[in-house]
């Protein structure tokens, strides 16, 4: 029941970053509003690209640039100029078809300043690890944060993966805990097995 989900919540669903430190789409909306486009141009495309064939999808791009253009499998769906008084997000509606969607952000002179791209994907076929550092002292006080994701057989990130992953640490390191950012996940932080949430899981090693 929905009430049971709320009872076991660890945090609010609101905010720009989840409990694992992973940015939500709102994080980039804030960036688009506050980052200087001259020094830190950016664009972020959402949601991920995996739906039913022909399903009508609203694709959104937030950017601090002057204008942004959407491409679906290389075909332009038009360029839109952003008006800061009406927000920094542009949207297009298009039927889903497998492949890639890409947004290109331009400055006032038509120069490309930022891009973002999403590819459609199949089921998880491999696990990928990315650590924030290569070594730690092993004294139990220094921590390494390791992001766990999955990719399909073609190497595309599976952005909605919820596979359960078990983590084992060999050598002097110790697994401190796991977090996937899902505030309603009943699994404990101090465990060696959790599901990915929105395709991501964080392992903390000391």
Question: Where do the language-model regions lie?
Answer:
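Short, solvent-exposed loop/linker segments at the N-terminal edge
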Residues: 49-55, 135-144
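Short, small-residue-biased leader/transition segments that mark boundaries at the very start
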Residues: 1-6
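Short flexible loop/turn segments that cap and initiate beta-strands
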Residues: 64-66, 70-77, 115-117, 143, ...
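Surface-exposed, short loops/turns at beta-strand junctions within beta-sandwich domains
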Residues: 93-98, 206
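Beta-strand-rich structural segments
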Residues: 59-62, 104, 141-158
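Aromatic- and carboxylate-lined catalytic core of secreted/periplasmic carbohydrate-active enzymes
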Residues: 11-59, 65
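Edge beta-strands of extracellular beta-sandwich domains
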Residues: 110-122
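Aromatic sugar-binding surface patches on proteins
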Residues: 83-90, 185-202
């Amino acid at each position: 029941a929905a009430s049971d989900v709320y009872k076991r919540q660890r945090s609010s669903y609101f905010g720009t970053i989840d409990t694992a430190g992973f940015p939500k789409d709102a994080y980039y909306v804030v960036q688009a509003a506050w980052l200087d486009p001259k020094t830190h141009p950016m664009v972020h495309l959402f949601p991920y690209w995996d739906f039913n064939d022909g399903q009508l999808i609203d694709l959104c791009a937030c950017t601090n640039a002057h204008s942004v253009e959407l491409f679906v499998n290389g075909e332009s769906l038009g360029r839109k100029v952003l008006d800061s008084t009406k927000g920094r997000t542009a949207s297009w509606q298009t039927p889903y078809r497998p492949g890639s969607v890409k947004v290109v952000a331009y400055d006032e002179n038509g120069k490309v300043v930022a891009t973002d791209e999403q590819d459609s994907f199949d089921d998880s076929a491999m696990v990928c690890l990315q650590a924030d550092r290569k070594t730690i002292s092993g004294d139990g006080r220094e921590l390494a944060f390791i992001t766990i994701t999955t990719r399909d057989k073609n190497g595309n990130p599976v952005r909605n993966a919820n596979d359960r992953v078990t983590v084992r640490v060999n050598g002097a390191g110790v697994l401190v805990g796991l977090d996937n950012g899902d505030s309603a996940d009943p699994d404990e932080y101090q465990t060696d097995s959790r599901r990915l949430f929105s395709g991501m899981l964080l392992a903390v090693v000391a």
